């Protein structure tokens, strides 16, 4: 791996931090490599969901967004699974990925498009109705979809009359002493200089090769900041990764370009502020940001019923967070964790805490040498072998230590 950083909390206080390796890599000129540091920022993937959940819950506290109401009331158009036209899709179901919405090949649309392009048969983004599960009723099945959080971004814009990224910076990040951003072009020059990249080991043809040099997969700007208010679409298909100006974007029509469920660039230090907020039950350094009930709602998976009204097993996914139950340490302890993790463009990041305690941790790793689909990279328990290795090591360090 190019670099890795961790921060550990015990009883609500930081007890350990370490940062090793490089945040940027220049294979041709290694003297230009930049070190991995506490304040180095990375695109943290699904960890971003925690902050979008913070935002949605804060809007609910202010009476601007009801999480159990039909989201069509906030989106400005009807959003129904065609197989269940009489069943509402709610904000809560967007947050916990039980909406029955599905990702297609493209999850981030250009600014000139609207999210309606995903749902209109005449649109090239409709993909023959791929954005709806055909045999699942809303609220009954979990499947992760970036589209859920893209629509939450739209709702945030329509209810606040501010751009998604700007509202989150002014009303969430500022309260936590965070200078993170979804738009690398809008960092100050000083903060942009701290931006790290995600790397993959691929050959010149783009094939995975663990003996090849590190290749930039995301945010490999090589020190050159993009033009202000511009953003590259965060789709895995390179043909759909063009860079666009945000200046003419229409508020409340397409927040997918920010990737509200994946596109946040934030440092380990700043993630530790979010962990402090969660461990403090909604307070950060003496200031109340969210309610205690908000934090409880985030960690609580839904209790679900089938079509006959019979209770089925609860999902592990709450609002922007999910549970990892029964994680084993080297000494045989069984640890229950809750949080979120990202694994995208070579970057692995996570923010977790131990249920029922004020212990938690953060990690960021910025490169992988083999394909995520390689059997060596897949974990039967976590789905991600790197996540398993990192979390098991941290869990043993935090909770097996005498």
Predicted regions and their residues:
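Active-site SXXK
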Residues: 6, 12, 43-71, 149-157, ...
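Short, conserved catalytic-motif segment at the N-terminal edge
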Residues: 1-42, 131
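Short, gly/Ser/Thr-rich active-site loops of penicillin-recognizing serine hydrolases
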Residues: 280, 299-308, 312, 326, ...
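Short, glycine/proline-biased beta-turn/loop segments that scaffold the active-site neighborhood
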Residues: 67-83, 174-176
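Beta-propeller and closely related beta-sheet repeat lectin domains
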Residues: 42, 140, 262, 349-350
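Short, surface-exposed loop or secondary-structure junction motifs
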Residues: 24, 83-335
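Structural recognition of the beta-strand scaffold that forms the well-ordered cores
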Residues: 5-8, 16, 43, 93-96, ...
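Short, well-ordered beta-strand elements
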Residues: 337-340, 348-375
């Amino acid at each position: 791996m190019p670099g890795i950083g961790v921060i550990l909390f015990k009883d609500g206080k930081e007890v350990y931090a370490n940062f090793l390796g490089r945040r940027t890599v220049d294979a041709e000129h290694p003297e230009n490599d930049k070190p991995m540091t506490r304040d180095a920022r990375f695109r943290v993937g699904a960890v971003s969901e925690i902050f979008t959940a913070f935002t949605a819950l804060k809007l609910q506290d202010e009476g601007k967004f009801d999480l159990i109401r039909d989201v069509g009331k906030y989106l400005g158009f009807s959003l129904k699974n065609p197989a269940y036209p009489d069943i509402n899709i709610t904000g809560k179901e967007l947050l916990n990925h039980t909406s029955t919405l599905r990702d297609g090949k493209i999850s981030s649309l250009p600014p000139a498009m609207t999210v309606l392009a995903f749902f209109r048969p005449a649109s090239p983004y409709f993909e023959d109705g791929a954005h709806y599960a055909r045999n699942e009723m809303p609220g009954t099945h979990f499947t992760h979809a970036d589209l859920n959080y893209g629509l939450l971004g739209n709702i945030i814009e329509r209810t606040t009359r501010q751009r998604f990224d700007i509202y989150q910076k002014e009303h969430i990040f500022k309260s936590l002493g965070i200078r993170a951003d979804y738009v690398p072009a809008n960092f100050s020059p000083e903060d942009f200089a701290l931006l790290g990249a995600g790397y993959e080991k691929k050959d010149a043809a783009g094939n995975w090769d663990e003996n090849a040099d590190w290749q930039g997969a995301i945010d490999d700007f090589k020190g050159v900041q993009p033009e202000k208010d511009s953003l590259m679409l965060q789709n895995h298909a390179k043909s759909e990764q063009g860079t666009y100006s945000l200046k003419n974007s229409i508020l409340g029509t397409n927040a997918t370009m920010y990737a509200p469920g994946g596109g946040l660039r934030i440092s380990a230090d700043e993630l530790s502020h979010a962990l402090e907020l969660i461990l403090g039950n909604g307070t950060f350094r003496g200031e109340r940001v969210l309610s205690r009930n908000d934090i409880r709602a985030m960690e609580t998976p839904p209790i679900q019923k089938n079509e006959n009204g019979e209770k089925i097993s609860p999902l592990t996914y709450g609002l922007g967070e999910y549970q990892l139950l029964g994680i084993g340490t080297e000494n045989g302890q069984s640890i229950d964790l809750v949080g979120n993790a990202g694994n995208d463009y070579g970057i692995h990041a996570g923010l977790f805490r131990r249920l029922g305690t004020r212990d938690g941790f953060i990690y960021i790793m910025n490169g992988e040498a083999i394909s995520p689909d390689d059997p060596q990279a897949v974990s039967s328990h976590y789905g991600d072998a790197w996540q398993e290795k990192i979390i098991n090591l941290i869990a043993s360090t935090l909770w097996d230590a005498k």
